[in-house]
Amino acid sequence: MKFYASSQIGIGKAENEDRIILGKSVIAGGSFITNIENGIVAVADGVGGNNAGEIASHFVATRLSNAQSVSFESLSQINTDLIDLSHVNPQYKNMATTLSGINFNKDKTLIFHIGNTRVYALQGSKYLKQLTNDDTTLNYLLVSGRLSPEDAISFDKKNEIIACFGGGTAALFKANVSAVDILSPILITSDGIHDYLSVDELEDTIDNYGISLQACERLIELARQNGSKDDASVIMGGVE
C-alpha cells in the first residue's frame, strides 16, 4: 500500500510539534512517499499549551515506529514511560501529545486514537467519513447536548483536549483501540489542517488532486490560506 505524507512547521514557531509515523520512520517535517504492507501509519501532535510538546510527540512516535503492533496495553505502557520521563526534567513537566493512526497487519487492522488528531476513510473515492471522535471539551459539550452547534461557532476553548498521552497524570490516558475493516483510502490529519478546512474542502482537494503528495501539500497550503498558523500534518493512502 502506498502512502503520501507531508508535515510543515507552524508560522512563527521554533519547533514542529507534529510527528508523522510511516512504518519505521518518524518524520518531523517535509514530504514523503512510501510503501507499507504491514505496519503503523499515524500522526502525533504535541500539545502546544504544555511544555516540550515536540519531545512528547517524538517520544511516542519513536516508540510506535519500533513496535510491530498496537494494543491498548502497549499504548498504556508508552504513556506511563512518557509521564516518567516528564519527571526527569522540569522543562518536560506535563508534556503531552495526541495520537491517531492505523496499524495494518496480516491478522487484523486496528485504529487507535487519543486527543484531537483525526482519521478519516475516503468512501466511494469521494466522501470522507471521520472514524475518530475528538477528545475535546467542545465535542464533549456538543455530544452531551450542553452546547448547540450554533453556540459552538463562538466557543472559546475549541482546542482544549480532555484526553492525551502524558499531561502529568495517567487520568488523561483514555485511548481507543479497535479493529476496523479498511476497504478504502485513509486520511490522517493534525488539527492544523482540519480545524481550518471544512469536510467539503478536504473532499474537493482529494477529488481534484487524487490520493497524492500534491494533495497533501495542497491541504497544508489551503489551511494556511484559511488562517492556520499551527503545525500541519497530513497522511493519505492505503487501500485503493
List each language-model region with its residue ranges.
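PP2C/PPM-type serine/threonine phosphatase catalytic domain
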Residues: 1-240
